Each structure stands twice: as structure tokens, then as C-alpha cells.
Amino acid sequence: MINIEKVKREFDMYVSNFDKKQGRIKLKIEHIERVAKISALIAKDLNLNEEQTILAETIGFFHDIGRFKQVEMYDTFSDKDSVNHAKLGTQILFDENLIEKFDIEDKYREIIKKAILNHNKDRIEEGLTKEENLFCKIIRDADKLDIFYVICNYDFENAFWYKDFECESISEKIMNEFKSEHKINYKDIKNNADEISVPFAYVYDLYFNFSLKYLKERQYLTKYANLVCKKFTSEKVHEQTMELLKCILVSFHQTYF
């Protein structure tokens, strides 16, 4: 079984190589620690055993391990402007053998690798084992849940790469995709107003009832919508944001939100 206390110690040792006082480094450390906790909560809610719960928590600590090098090398969290942080993370862990410091048994390694590689994809790849697929779902949900926390509690400019809060509107293409398909094509995102739709679309990509309840209890969707309306200056953007929120409420018949 994985020694989760050793995982925590070695994670702390690894991130000590970076400037923890730097805003984005600090943000990412805190995000990773929360995602690990949420992953364990999801596993427990699914009645997984102790070994599986610890594995889920461990994946939480590893899922964004590539972010630190990404910021150091490219000064951004934007994959499109740098590198795929999930692939970078697996290179650091497995190709550069950082994984050896954590004393992770071989039987867990492929599950961990698949979970990291799939946590930031549009959808989980096909051909995975049942166990690999399960842990991919857990980390994807846990990551999205804490992204809402980050959005609602950190500056947009620091947490992401929002710079322009004067965009006039979310594109009609994005709005139509969201309302008709309950998803968006990331290639269609052209500006920061279009980016607004991304967290809303996350809701349709959550796998577990626990995750929907978690969002509701913390009122993240309403908080996010209100924050967007506070940050962006365009009345059109405000209207569209509330339209996206309403679409979610209708879709779920307000069962959760």
C-alpha cells in the first residue's frame, strides 16, 4: 500500500525547489493539496477501500506536478502558450524518475500515469481498464471542483490568464454550443469573454453525484456568475453569463443548483 505520509513529505521536498512566495507557485501548491483531499472524499463517498482511497489521494498530489516547471520555464499556466502540463508531469515523474522518491509500487504506476494524462483532456481516452477509468474520473472531478474554489477565491489575473475584462460579448458560436450540446469546443474560444463559458461547461462533465452536491453546498456556480458580472464591464456579458447559469439550472431541474 502507498505510504501517503511519505507522498506528502516528498511532494513538499519537490516543491521546495521552487519559489513558494511567488503567487502562482503558492496557488498551485494549495490547489494540489485541496485536490488530493477532495479525491479522497470522492473515493470514500464511492465506498472504495483504504488502498484505493489512498491511491486517489496520491493521484491528487501528482496530477499537476508539471505546473511548477511550466511556470518556471514559460511563466504561464496556459498550455496553449507553452506545453501540455499533464504530459510534462508524466515526463518528470516517469521519464526523469521522480516517482522513485515516493516509493510507489509498480502496480499503481500505470493507473497514476493514465490519470495524470487524462485529467486535462476534453474527454477520457478509450481503451482504459475499468480501474484506470475510475481513477481518471475521480481526479477529473476533484480538479474541477477545486478550480471553482480557485476562481471564487483568487484573482482571475493570478489564477488564470485573464487580462481583458472589457470584451463586449461571448461569441454566438460558444453560446449556441453550450445551450445545444452542453459543451464547448475549446478551439472556438477567441477571447476572455469566451473563457467564461469553460467553468460552466465543467458541470456537464462531472461524473459523480458527490461532485454536484459539493458545488451546490458551496454555491460555486452563483458565486462564479456574480464574480464574472463584477469583473467584466459589458452588460451583454452579464446577460450571457446569467443565461449560461440558467441553462444549467434548467438542465438539472434545479435538483442540485
Regions found by a protein language model. Name each.
Residues 1-87, 129:
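Acidic/His-rich, divalent-metal-binding segments that scaffold phosphate/diphosphate chemistry
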Residues 23-29, 33, 37, 41-49, ...:
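Divalent metal-dependent phosphate-bond-processing catalytic cores, especially two-metal-ion Mg2+/Mn2+ enzymes
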Residues 3, 25-28, 80-85, 104-108, ...:
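A generic short-segment signal for beta-strand/edge and adjacent turn/coil regions
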Residues 47-58, 99-117, 131-138:
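Acidic/histidine metal-binding catalytic segments
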Residues 2-5, 9-12, 50, 87, ...:
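Generic alpha-helical secondary structure signal
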Residues 68-111, 122:
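Hydrophobic/aromatic-rich structural module bridging two neighboring secondary-structure elements via a short loop
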Residues 18, 100, 109, 158-165:
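A broad, low-specificity signal for short, low-complexity segments enriched in glycine/proline
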